[in-house]
């Protein structure tokens, strides 16, 4: 767990050493980027994140104030901190990510920030249609060819199958982590869960998997963590500030449905082929039916946390509240990394 804590705290530490040894580092934004292809190409995939309190500087000038602050903070890190990246992949997982891609592409075209790496869009769609599956397969074939040219080596079927199998093993370990957060265990806090999962987006898969399995072994015999069990929905959390504030106030975050979480709601493993990956990413979701998530986690309350300029979760709250057998609270217009704990309390911890 100590090694995973360190990787989470400095998510570019391994990228710097990887590059120093002549390797290629591919940064990515959003969970729809098929990291299996990056791994199969022999490159290190590193997911970018924001940091509350980071000065926004030129990022605010380029994108404006009407974009989710997590995306603005991520953008500011790219502009001002020059992370060790050779290539950046941006998925079409949200409008904020798409705006980020367009801004980066235009900035590079104009030569305004010469230190930025090349940026490509990964346009994976999620409609339940055969035409969508065909479209996604074309996009993944295109990404495969471009990665092959970029790294100067072919991505053969055996390498792709091995990478897909390795990433599926990671997902299985994350599901085991979700069990340890559930009833009868409560072996780790939400902050710890977010850390253990997030570290995996900064390490090579073959280094991360044994560390995560080791952490599962360490956690198996732990005494239950204290706190009122809380299920979190709404905006994603790429850093632990909100979790820490909630747990300092007496809650215990036992599950979430955002793509930085433990992935308990993800579909079964993908077939280890490009066609299989295209279908898996088409159907990929981290959202369980709300009542099923409450039953699995044993949550006593549900919190829908919604950041300013990330309004999509607002549309879901009424249906979520109607579906769950426990109290549900909507907390809207929250600042990135912060939470109004007094408004969450209700009949929870004091």
Language-model-detected regions and their locations in the chain:
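Acidic/His-rich segments in extracytoplasmic proteins that coordinate ligands and/or metal ions
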Residues: 73-149
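Redox- and metal-dependent alpha/beta enzyme cores, enriched for Fe-S-associated oxidoreductases
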Residues: 30-50, 227, 233-293
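A short, acidic, amphipathic alpha-helical segment used as a generic capping/interface helix at domain edges
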Residues: 77-78, 283-298, 315-316
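An N-terminal, globular interaction/scaffold subdomain
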Residues: 25-97, 101
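Peripheral docking tails and interdomain loops at the edges
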Residues: 317-350
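Short, acidic/turn-prone active-site loops that include or flank metal/cofactor-
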Residues: 49-55, 60, 124-125, 257-262, ...
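Proline-aspartate-enriched helix->loop->beta-strand connector
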Residues: 85, 294, 298-304
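A charged, amphipathic alpha-helical module
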Residues: 2-24, 137, 141, 145-265
């Amino acid at each position: 767990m100590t090694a995973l804590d360190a990787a989470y705290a400095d998510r570019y530490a391994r990228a710097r050493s990887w590059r120093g040894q002549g390797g290629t580092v591919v940064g990515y934004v959003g969970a729809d980027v098929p990291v299996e292809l990056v791994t199969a190409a022999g490159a290190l995939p590193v997911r970018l994140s924001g940091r509350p309190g980071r000065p926004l500087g030129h990022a605010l000038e380029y994108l404006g104030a009407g974009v989710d602050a997590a995306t603005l903070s991520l953008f500011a890190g790219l502009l001002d901190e020059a992370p060790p990246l050779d290539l950046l992949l941006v998925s079409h997982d949200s409008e904020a990510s798409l705006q980020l891609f367009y801004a980066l592409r235009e900035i590079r075209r104009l030569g305004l920030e010469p230190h930025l790496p090349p940026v490509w869009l990964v346009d994976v769609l999620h409609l339940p249609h055969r035409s969508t599956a065909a479209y996604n397969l074309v996009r993944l074939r295109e990404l495969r060819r471009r990665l092959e040219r970029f790294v100067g080596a072919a991505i053969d079927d055996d390498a792709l199958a091995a990478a897909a199998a390795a990433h599926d093993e990671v997902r299985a370990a994350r599901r085991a982590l979700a069990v340890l957060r559930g009833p009868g265990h409560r072996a780790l806090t939400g902050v710890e869960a977010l850390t253990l999962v997030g570290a995996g987006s900064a390490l090579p898969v073959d280094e991360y998997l044994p560390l995560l399995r080791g952490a599962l072994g360490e956690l198996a015999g732990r005494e239950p963590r204290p706190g009122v069990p809380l299920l979190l929905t709404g905006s994603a959390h790429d850093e632990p500030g909100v979790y820490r504030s909630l747990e300092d106030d007496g809650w215990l975050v036992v599950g979430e449905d955002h793509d930085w979480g433990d992935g308990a709601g993800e579909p079964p493993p993908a077939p280890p082929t490009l066609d299989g990956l295209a279908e898996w990413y088409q159907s990929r979701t981290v959202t369980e039916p709300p009542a099923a998530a409450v039953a699995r986690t044993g949550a006593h309350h549900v919190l829908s946390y919604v950041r300013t300029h990330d309004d999509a979760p607002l549309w879901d709250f009424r249906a979520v509240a109607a579906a769950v057998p426990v109290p549900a609270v909507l907390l809207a217009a929250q600042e990135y990394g912060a939470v109004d704990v007094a408004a969450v309390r209700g009949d929870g911890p004091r």
